[in-house]
Every structure is written in C-alpha cells, then in structure tokens.
Amino acid sequence: MDSNSWINCPPVFSSSPSSRRYQSRSDLYLGDVEGEDDLKAEFMCPFCADEFDIVGLCCHIDVNHPVEAKNGVCPVCTKKVGLDIVGHITTQHGNVFKVQRRRRLRKGGYSSTYLTLKKELREANLQSLGGSSTFIPSSNIDSDPLLSSFMFKPPSAIPITEGDSVAQVSPKDTSKSKIQQESFSNEDQEKAKKSKFVRGLLWSTMLEDKF
C-alpha cells in the first residue's frame, strides 16, 4: 500500500477515535484512474458551502465539523451518510484521491489552503497532548527572541577585565564567583533542556513535512 495517501496531514499521536480514523484512511491505494479528467477538481463542504479539493475537504471537515460529520450528505455522490462522512469518502471514493494526487503532482505542490489545514491539524494534535497550540515555523525563529535565545545563544560567561589575576582575588570574591557560576550553570542547564525540546519539536515537524 502506498503511504503517500491524502493523509499527509500530520500524524495524530493520541489513541482517540479520530486518530484511528486517520490511520485507516492512510491505507488508501493510489494507482491509475480511468476518466480522471471527468472528475471535479473541487467539492463543496456540506456544512459551510466552502469549496476544497477532496484532500482539503476531508481535512476541513475533520477540523471544523467533527460533530456534524457524523450525519450529512456526501459531497461526492450526494447520498445521505448516516455515520462519518469523511470515512465514507475515503473508503467509497478512493479513486477521487488518486486523481487529486495526480493533479497535485502535475501542478508541483499543495495549495496554501491545504497547508493551512495541515497546520491546524498539527496544532490540534499538540493541544490534545497538553502542549502549546502555537507552531513556530523555522522562518520565524529569528523574530521570536525567546525561541532564538533557546536555540542560538551560547552560555553566558563572566567578563574578565585586563589586569585581573588570581593573586588579586580575595577569598570573599572567590566565594561570590562560585555562587555566580553555579547560578549561571543552573540557568544554562534549564536553557539547554528547553533548547533540546524545541529542536526536537522542530525536527519532528520538518520530518512530517518531508514524508
């Protein structure tokens, strides 16, 4: 089975029913499709009338209409679905996903709408894990002083002026220096832990985008 199905939406890390739905949808087979030019490029959301391609529509319904999606009209076949519209689309209309993938490959990428929906799903996943719901892309790292301080600032050092020598340092000064060094050391350790967490989060996000 091809792992490059529509569910290039970020992986869901919880064991909730929605995560199991995503996993089952990731098993769609993508191959040659007959009459792909006859299929619509976009479909209207049955709940808010916005138009998306089939991939974007499924992401949109899962994010914005999870409750309504349990009962509604399929936008592809216009039949009334009594349970899980997105599950119905992915299982009964897999050929549409194949067509959309071919069209995306010909155009050379994904639409900004799809990328926005993908980001929303990632933020929802982080929220479900009790983490922050704000995702900061690598291009915005420089504009975020807190994140920048975690990732790029070297450990602080105690300045030493010319003329200072070991002989000139009294025991009292040495004691103060040790306290300062311990304080800096604790602060650096805390920054290192935060930096490691942020780097791991950014790396996992970049790997998701690649695969």
Swiss-Prot record:
Disruption phenotype: Plants show a hypersensitive hypocotyl growth response to both red and blue light. Keywords: Nucleus, Phosphoprotein. Disulfide bonds: none annotated. Residues 167-186 have a biased composition (Polar residues). Expressed in seedlings, roots, leaves, stems, flowers and siliques. It is found in: Nucleus. Belongs to the Di19 family. Involved in both red and blue light signaling. This is Protein DEHYDRATION-INDUCED 19 homolog 7.
